[in-house]
Design a protein with these regions (language model features):
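Multi-bladed beta-propeller domains
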Residues: 1-11, 44-63, 90-106, 133-135, ...
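Cap/lid segment of the alpha/beta-hydrolase catalytic domain
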Residues: 376-494, 501, 533-535, 539
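Predominantly five- to eight-bladed beta-propeller fold
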Residues: 39-41, 124-173, 217, 266, ...
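Hydrophobic beta-strand positions that form the internal "hydrophobic ladder"
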Residues: 24, 71-74, 119-120, 201-202, ...
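Short, solvent-exposed loop/turn segments at conserved positions within beta-propeller repeat blades
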Residues: 34-39, 80-85, 158-164, 211-217, ...
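Residue-level detector of Asp-centered blade-edge/turn motifs that repeat once per structural unit
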Residues: 19-20, 69-70, 114-115, 196-197, ...
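Active-site-proximal cap/loop segments of hydrolase catalytic domains
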Residues: 452-641
Length: 641
């Protein structure tokens, strides 16, 4: 795979089924390198495979399709030239889409009412005079912002305290219906879910007194026509994905303990009227239902007997059906692959599933029989030679097992080797097509990557093993994995580089400050100094106390910048100018420290980008980044290097 092969990627998402399970709609995203933008259309296909998929819409970027419960209508989000996704609806049998509402900042998510007549959705409501609400006042001439809270901005979104997300309801069938704002107040609201009778909406919000000082949120229920909201969960949890049981008596949701430090996300339930305490259904030693692990919406699908949701397990994301009485779950889709999105209707399970050689295909299960209905990955497969992942297990010095993978180029080695470290730290590498690894393998480098302690998908003790001790057990695990990989004679142990982004950037800088075994390093969007990160990052105010502690000496001891005087390895630092997660000062401080000591170092800055450059940045910037990375490895890991 080469950098410009990004244009050949097709990424399906958000499958939705008609109630009889016969027809499926799915969004398919793609990159247009000539226009330097992302595009997407909706496709329709019969679930019995009797006809090939056909493109159903032709908007600039159409995403998140959802059939109405009666199957007559298809709602979706369409982004026009202003990049603001707006809610649209069209007849399932065709016709022109109709926009239901227009919001200056677009619509974020939505849900059909049970009777197929209304749609609840979430949209940010900007303060008057900001974000284009006054056409005579451009952004640079807006009044100053007065900040009084910890939580006032989010990477890749921007300032949030002056554009709160609220829940609205709109008549989906009336021509000129006016949306009704259901929620009010200086709070964030999201993830609306309808009660079975269509009278109420459950949603997620944080309205408790200390909401600015913690990550706690609750499930609330309010009349769909507007009115006072009732909190039904009064817990110390961060909640998401509420869904009513069919009888309306119970609300199911996922939640994680609010310190968020290596904690798996669990499945919970609570009486819908708030009369009882929430109860946990699943075990943090066995499951993790974090919706962030998928690429899309990942709802909870609740019926009389079970809740269908995903779980992360050793790099795989499986789709399971959990009995509401607490029995053993049934696996609907498993194996060494990743379930991104899913839907269930009419006895059919539909999902977008990826694996190491495919960015995603639509898979259906009917009567226990699995069938793949699409071949979206064929375009990339024809243009690029994709390489398989070989599973690897290593043993750390203390006996802990470390799980990972090797990807090797075609041909015979020994190949120069790149050790990759993921972000998070409570994240994971897994069984899916990873464009970065494929590009490096395509350029002739073996890639080693894995999930050291601190990663997700291996139980809570594994995830929390590094709390208060960054750079110790995790670095031992990473190096143990590299040592195990280098036992393969196809990998050249004398030509090894290391790279990673975010927490992976932290680990990259940490490693070159503690060993000289690497020829070169690439540290991207890194956290290098937790003392300044605590104040400059959008999450620093809670991340550092929860993950690194409050003792200043210990915080500095866990900061790679503390050991900059030990670094002699050539380093390429890559950062985005608008990164609010790991702000640019994290790269600048390291750059200056190394320049002052005459260490070979370069700083590559991307204008207009945030923390998500490698995943959703401007396509031309993603290609430029790939080219810079390959140039750096060519200079430092080449056979004559």
């Amino acid at each position: 795979m080469q950098p410009r092969d990004l244009a050949h990627l097709r990424t399906p998402s958000a499958p939705t089924l008609t109630p009889d399970g016969r027809l499926l709609a799915v969004a398919v995203g793609r990159i247009d390198l000539e226009a330097d933008e992302y595009r997407g259309e909706l496709w329709l296909l019969p679930t019995d495979g009797s006809a090939p998929p056909r493109r159903f819409t032709s908007g600039r970027r159409d995403v998140r399709p959802r059939f109405s419960p009666d199957g007559r209508w298809l709602a979706f989000l369409r982004a026009g030239d202003d990049d603001k996704p707006q809610l649209h609806v069209m007849a399932t049998d065709g016709g022109e889409p109709r926009r239901l509402a227009e919001h200056p900042l677009g619509v974020e998510s939505f849900a059909w009412s049970p009777d197929s007549t209304r749609i609840a959705y979430v949209a940010r409501v900007p303060q008057e005079g900001r974000y284009g609400t006054n056409k005579d006042v451009p952004p640079e001439k807006e009044p100053p912002r007065r900040i009084t809270t910890f939580q006032y901005r989010v990477d890749n979104i921007g300032f949030t305290f002056d554009r709160r997300p609220h829940v609205f309801v709109v008549d989906a069938l009336a021509e000129d219906a006016e949306p009704v704002q259901v929620t009010r107040g200086d709070y964030d609201h999201g993830e609306p879910a309808w009660s079975p009778d269509g009278a109420s909406l459950a949603f997620v919000s944080a309205r408790h007194e200390t909401r600015d000082e913690d990550a706690i949120s609750d499930v609330f229920v309010a009349p769909a026509a507007g009115g006072d909201a009732v909190r039904v969960t009064a817990t110390d949890l961060a909640v998401a994905r509420p869904a009513f049981s069919p009888d309306g008596a119970t609300i199911w949701f996922v939640a994680v303990e609010p310190d968020l430090a290596g904690r798996p996300t669990m499945l919970w339930s609570v009486p819908a009227d708030g009369s009882g305490k929430p109860e946990r259904l699943t075990d943090p030693e066995r499951y993790d239902h974090d919706p962030a692990f998928g690429a899309g919406i990942l709802p909870l699908l609740v019926d009389e007997d079970a809740v269908t949701t995903i779980t992360l397990d050793r790099g795989a994301i499986r789709l399971l059906r959990f009995p509401v009485d607490g029995g053993e779950p049934a696996e609907l889709l498993g194996g060494q692959r990743t379930v991104h999105d899913y839907a269930v209707a009419g006895g059919v399970v539909a999902a977008v599933v990826s694996h190491p050689l495919s960015a995603g295909e639509v898979v259906v299960v009917r009567d226990g029989q699995e069938r793949t209905l699409t071949d979206f990955g064929s375009l990339l497969a024809r243009s690029a030679s994709l390489r398989p992942m070989e599973e690897l297990e290593a043993t750390a010095p203390d006996g802990a097992k470390v799980h990972g993978w090797i990807l090797k180029p075609a041909g015979t080695g020994p190949f120069p080797t790149v050790l990759m470290v993921h972000g998070g730290p409570f994240a994971h590498y897994g069984w899916t097509l990873f464009d970065e690894a494929q590009v490096y393998v395509g350029a002739g480098y073996a890639v080693v990557m894995g999930n050291p302690r601190g990663s997700a998908g291996y139980g809570e003790p594994h995830g929390r093993a590094i709390v208060g001790d960054f750079g110790n057990l995790d670095s031992q695990d990473v190096l143990a994995l590299l040592d195990a990989a280098l036992e393969d004679p196809d990998l050249d142990g004398d030509r090894v580089g290391v790279m990673g982004g975010s927490y992976g950037g932290f680990m990259t800088t940490w490693l070159v400050g503690h060993t000289d075994r690497f020829r070169a390093a690439i540290s991207e969007r890194a956290c290098n100094a937790f003392d300044s990160f605590e104040g400059s990052s959008d999450i620093g105010w809670f991340f550092v106390p929860k993950y690194n502690g409050t003792d200043r000496d210990r915080v500095l001891a866990q900061s790679p910048l503390t050991y900059a005087d030990r670094i002699g390895t050539p380093m390429l630092l890559i950062h985005s100018e608008q990164d609010w997660r790991c702000p640019i000062e994290q790269a600048q401080r390291l750059f200056v420290a190394l320049k002052q000591r005459k260490v070979e170092v370069e700083l590559l800055l991307f204008p207009g980008e945030g923390h998500e450059l490698t995943r959703s940045g401007l396509p031309s910037h993603r290609v430029a980044r790939f080219e810079a990375v390959l140039d750096w490895w060519r200079r430092h890991l080449s056979p004559a290097g």
